[in-house]
Design a protein with these regions (language model features):
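Residue-level detector of flexible, active-site-proximal loop/helix-junction positions
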Residues: 24, 51, 83
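Conserved catalytic cores of phosphodiester-cleaving nucleases, focusing on short active-site segments
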Residues: 8-26, 37
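Non-catalytic C-terminal interaction segments of nucleic acid-processing enzymes
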Residues: 63-227
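A broadly used, surface-exposed interaction patch
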Residues: 1-5
Length: 227
């Protein structure tokens, strides 16, 4: 693509650029590369190499590779050259400890239509869900984080004090839902959709749940209020 000074690893149907990203890069660089594709009329999909595979935590860089669909929520793609497979990590959520919860679909190389596979998050499909037990040890974890002066938890405690509350007195049930949608203070480079209503629907859905002994994670389409 001489017009934007970039070389895609693969083009699909002359409108979708596939980029294999094997190592970390500055978020600002990723944002610029994504924007350049968009302005040239191309959609770009990032396939993450081994060093960037999703592990226990969602880094700030990972968040800039996230895509979003109502049927599969936040998701990203991993390329595994050793196992000869493409992996879709979807329904990506974070708990209050910062740990990732998600589901995975595996696509062996050479099986199926590549474009159909890449379109799967946006295709009509049977919807998946993920069930997680209540984190009963969360209050102790939060007390520990405050003791060691974790900046994030100290900031939340300051907010809590301003409302006349104290994080240390909250029970595990009062923290429900423990597992939440990813958030990014700088937005998401790959997502143009305004997610305000998605977050609102999520909060309202779990605010109405009476059984707080478990949390069932659904695709965002499930949280949408009936018209």
């Amino acid at each position: 693509l001489t017009s934007i000074g970039q070389v895609a690893d693969l083009f699909v149907n002359n409108s979708l650029a596939l980029e294999v990203q094997c190592s970390g890069l500055p978020i600002s660089r990723l944002q610029l590369r994504t924007q350049a594709y968009s302005e040239a009329g191309y959609q770009v999909l990032w396939l993450l190499g081994k060093d960037l595979w999703l592990k226990e935590r969602l880094t700030n860089l990972h968040k800039q590779f996230l895509s979003f669909s109502m049927n599969m929520g936040f998701h990203l793609w991993e390329l595994d050259d050793e196992k000869k497979e493409l992996r879709l990590r979807y329904l990506i959520h974070e708990d209050l400890r910062g740990k990732v919860h998600c589901l995975t679909k595996v696509f062996p190389f050479g099986e199926g239509n590549l474009l159909d596979i890449l379109r799967l998050p946006f295709a009509k499909q049977a919807l998946s869900h993920l069930t997680c037990p209540l984190d009963r040890d969360l209050p102790r974890y939060i007390a520990q984080q405050l003791y060691y002066k974790s900046p994030n938890w100290l900031a939340l405690q300051a907010e809590s004090y301003s409302r006349g509350e104290n994080l240390l007195t909250k029970t595990a049930e009062e923290w429900y839902p423990h597992i939440r949608l990813p958030r990014s203070a700088i937005g998401f480079a790959q997502i143009q959709k305004d997610l305000t209503l998605v977050y609102q629907d999520f909060d309202q859905y779990y605010g109405n749940i009476e059984d707080k002994q478990k949390q069932v994670l659904y695709p965002p389409i499930i949280y949408r209020k009936p018209m």
